[in-house]
């Protein structure tokens, strides 16, 4: 996700997206733990970065409200 796309979202939408991505990350880690080889090993890295990006922009939005 691009930061510009995230900034257009509301805080509730950001929270929902974070939950979705964390669930997907847990599934991907579960597959990896079971010993299966991943088609694209960058998936976990990209999910973690997207979650971090969402949390950062959420924090920015909350600080603006103060």
From Swiss-Prot:
One of its GO terms (molecular function) is structural constituent of ribosome. It comes from the Archaea. Belongs to the universal ribosomal protein uL29 family. Part of the 50S ribosomal subunit. Keywords: Ribonucleoprotein, Ribosomal protein. The keyword Lipoprotein does not apply. It comes from Thermococcus kodakarensis (strain ATCC BAA-918 / JCM 12380 / KOD1) (Pyrococcus kodakaraensis (strain KOD1)). InterPro entries: Ribosomal_uL29, Ribosomal_uL29_CS, Ribosomal_uL29_sf. One of its GO terms (biological process) is translation. One of its GO terms (cellular component) is ribonucleoprotein complex. HAMAP family: Ribosomal_uL29 (MF_00374). This is Large ribosomal subunit protein uL29.
